[in-house]
């Protein structure tokens, strides 16, 4: 009897977890599911324009979660992001910038954390490296680059330009 109850509880937990999993797996899917207030601004947002709105909070949660930089609660995966930032642009103190913006985001509710971090980070000396890191991971998730490919800023920029040109 106890085993059946435990099994049932486990099954329900699995189903609930599946129901809460992010349905999007690429930035493109996040853009397709963007809130109505931002539908006409996708091209602008792809140029890293910060926006304060509930729709942008949801969009940045989606994008940053898909590229692997935040978890489902908007918490920054600091070691993952820092490792890539240092590969992309080693001449900047990304750790200090990240600490500042993670601290700022920690004062926000979980639904606003990703966008708060994003907006803050765009205002730091990590801006160029962050853009490249997001773009690189977007390309990896879209299957346009492989993890075995070394980071090549020119290739990343060219592939992102192709995507942008197709959308905009």
Curated annotation (Swiss-Prot):
UniProtKB keywords: Disulfide bond, Secreted, Signal, Vasoactive, Vasodilator
Protein name in the entry: Short form salivary protein D7R2
GO MF entry, a single one: odorant binding
Residue sites binding noradrenaline per the record: 31, 46, 135, 138
Role played: Modulates blood feeding of female mosquitoes on vertebrate species by binding and sequestering different mediators involved in the host response. Binds serotonin, noradrenaline, histamine and adrenaline. Inhibits histamine-, serotonin- and noradrenaline-induced smooth muscle contraction. Exhibits vasodilating activity.
Source organism (scientific name): Anopheles gambiae
Entry similarity comment: Belongs to the PBP/GOBP family.
Protein's GO biological process: sensory perception of smell; vasodilation
CDD domains found in the cross-reference section: PBP_GOBP
Compartments, as annotated in UniProt: Secreted
InterPro entries, alphabetized: PBP/GOBP (IPR006170), PBP_GOBP_sf (IPR036728)
Presence of the UniProt keyword Secreted in the record: yes
Protein's gene: D7r2
